[in-house]
């Protein structure tokens, strides 16, 4: 057998939310992200938004029950997000925790050190009930 060819993969995480505009503002504040595109008031931003860090895609937000995408219909029919963690590494953990406090986010686990990767984490809930983890870089807590 020959060596497997390595593919270039870029994660493009998308979550369904009830209010794209509100969720976009929440995540922009939490992550220090910005919206993709020149017109932040474009009408389609009520249905879909892309959050960026520099030129890198961080998270896509899509309204429930719009544009008839499978699995993005019927928000109330089934639980969503169970077993999914939206995990973000942040350069300045203390500043990220301050943003969490300013947002008034529900904290699931207060800041703590994860002993395996030796980094700090805070686990919170976003406005749609998704679990969000903010973590410092691995080894930062040594």
Where do the model's predicted regions map?
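Active-site loop/turn elements of alpha/beta-hydrolase fold enzymes
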Residues: 66, 90, 112
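Generic structural signal for helix capping and beta-alpha/helix-loop junctions
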Residues: 43-45, 69, 117, 141
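Core segments of cupin and vicinal oxygen chelate
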Residues: 5-7, 14-59, 64
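Membrane-topology and secretion signals of cell-surface/extracellular proteins
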Residues: 56-69, 79, 83-85, 132-141
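Vicinal oxygen chelate
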Residues: 1-6, 10-19, 47-53, 72-142
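Short beta->alpha connector loops
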Residues: 41-42, 92, 114-115
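A short alpha-helix capping/helix-coil boundary motif
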Residues: 2-4, 27, 74-78
């Amino acid at each position: 057998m020959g060596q497997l060819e390595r593919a270039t993969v870029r994660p493009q995480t998308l979550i369904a939310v009830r209010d794209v505009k509100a969720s976009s503002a929440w995540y922009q504040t939490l992550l220090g992200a910005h919206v993709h595109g020149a017109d932040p008031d474009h009408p389609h931003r009520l249905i879909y938004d892309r959050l960026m860090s520099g030129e890198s895609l961080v998270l896509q937000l899509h309204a429930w029950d719009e544009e008839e995408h499978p699995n993005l219909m019927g928000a109330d029919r089934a639980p969503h997000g169970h077993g999914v963690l939206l995990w973000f590494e942040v350069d300045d953990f203390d500043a990220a925790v301050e943003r969490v406090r300013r947002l008034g986010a529900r904290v699931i686990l207060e800041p703590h050190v994860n002993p395996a990767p030796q980094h700090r984490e805070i686990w919170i809930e976003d406005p749609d009930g998704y679990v969000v983890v903010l973590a410092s870089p691995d080894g930062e807590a040594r």
